[in-house]
Amino acid sequence: MSASDKKRLRKEQNAAAMTERQKAEQKEAKKLKTYTLTFWVVIILCVSIVAGLFLQAPVETVLTRYTHAITVGNHELKAVELNYFYIDTINNYVNKNQSWISYLLNVNKPIGDQVSNKETGATWADDFLDMTIDEIKNTYSLYDAAVAAGHTLSEDEQKSLTTLQDNLKIYAEYYGHRNTNSYLTSIYGRGSHIDSYLKYYEISLMATSYYNKYSEDLKETYTPAMLREFEGDKPYEYNAYTYMSFYMSVDKFKTGGTKGEDGKITYTEEELQAARDALKKAAEELAVAENNTKDKLNEAIKNLEITLEEAKKTEDKTEDKTEDKTEDKTEDKTEDDKKEEEKKYSTVTENKKVLYSNLASVMQEWLRNTERKEGDITAIPQESTSTDKDGKEVKTLTGYYVVVYQSSTDNNYALANVRHILIPFEGGTTDPTTGVKKYTDAEKKAAKEKAEKLYKEWKDAGVLTEDSFAELAKKNSKDNADEGGLYEDIYPGQMVTNFNDWCFDESRKAGDTGIVETEYGHHIMFYVKDSETSYRDHMVSAAKLKKDMETWEKGLIDAISLDRVNVKYIDRDLILNSGY
């Protein structure tokens, strides 16, 4: 990993009170595994947890602050420290599952009153406690490993502890609390105190820091031979495939059926089997050699759908027993009418350079066949799996893919090293429903003119070097200015579309410059050079690193002991009221 990547990573870990815009911009940067230091979740209030009123009864406060709750390795955690992990674990879970959390449990009811497992009687409070225990083992196993290895926090990481205290004071005042301890209590409950919270944060930070350092160092040890060995006999897993596809559901071929009082149509097994047979026949008729081009296959699909449409009309007329008096007005249709009618028919989907892991599983074996050649076409069944009353697995045909192979690539091409100067759009209005900021043509034009002016001044100066561009970026870019706008080892799909397409244009070469527009603004681009790392090696290395880190981390976790001494002070009456 480059020095610039490491610096960006440190910024991501340590930047306190990070704004939503900053977070969105940093999604473009490469990241190692992120151990979420959930203080940030709390600080920006991503998830609202209504915990009721925390009574500050002196006895209860003392008990929570000093009761021995957990022993993990050689560490004794007090009840309040357990609560820090507990509340943050819940916050993370709710934040991660916010789109469907209200379908998982009642967010307006205490978690301790909601059974999550009818067989064991476990509640959601029990489940969250189990998740918390896992997080504690994870954190302390890494922390102990860090201490044993002599790992220390970087200067920036050390500064984040001071920044944390400052921000806690700011938020305490902002939300009307008399002091920082009162603010922490409103989040974590009785016994919360700045000293114990800072200890919790520092241990979590140390665990994160060491994980990332170990990961970086391990990745540096990988050789090309090690990567080829890791690929083993499955090199296709890192290839990408270009193909056309068309999916047909069995529902299109169902006929007959009986409509119930609720309006739903049910089919006999004979009718369902007839539909499956018709689907199979239609798919096989589409998947013939003469249909292996886009136009030919689209025409065949249209003809099939017209046939199905006519059959449906005939069936409906038979059921209604009424005479169809509709006049054929085909000759009266204008060209626009005909074009509009064409839109109602299905067409093939063109899929370009799709990674093997993103292919529909039923297509993978056929597409990866090394004997596959351009224009090959086939029909591939899609089945659902269920269990019958005797416990036997039953497969049922639900659809068919018609697939046309076009090409594949082993992704053995270089990643990109690029510098850029971002001239962002200014102004704009935020859509209240989507949260997306939109800019007027005038606002976009202003950014474009500013970028073009700066670009022209640089070119007119006549020193068109990387160094001169880097200096210009340091003075003018609104992104990564400290590093002269440098991004190294960019892989396809990492950056926004127009930025990505410029970087990976087949004609791109060192020294190329230009301006591209993205949703962020206008980027003045300077192509530094091809990276020494190929996209393929980047993917293989990432996959190997993930597996190696999981193995290493599991070993640490398995080696550390944990005893639940007294966990009764967790808040089982917590209400997750996220406003969904």
Where do the PLM segments sit?
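An exposure/low-complexity boundary signal
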Residues: K6-E12, M131, I136, S141, ...
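Internal, charge-rich low-complexity segments
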Residues: N91-Y103, V250-E261, K312-K321, E426-P432
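Sec/Tat-exported extracytoplasmic proteins
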Residues: Y86, Y93, I136, Y140, ...
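Residue-level detector of family-conserved "landmark" positions at structurally sensitive sites
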Residues: D156-Q158, E483-G484, I570
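Peptidyl-prolyl cis-trans isomerase
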Residues: K281-Q364, K450-N498, V528
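N-terminal targeting/tethering segments
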Residues: V59-D195, Y267
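PPIase-associated folding chaperone regions across multiple families
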Residues: L9-V41, L45-R65, Y183-D277, K281-E284, ...
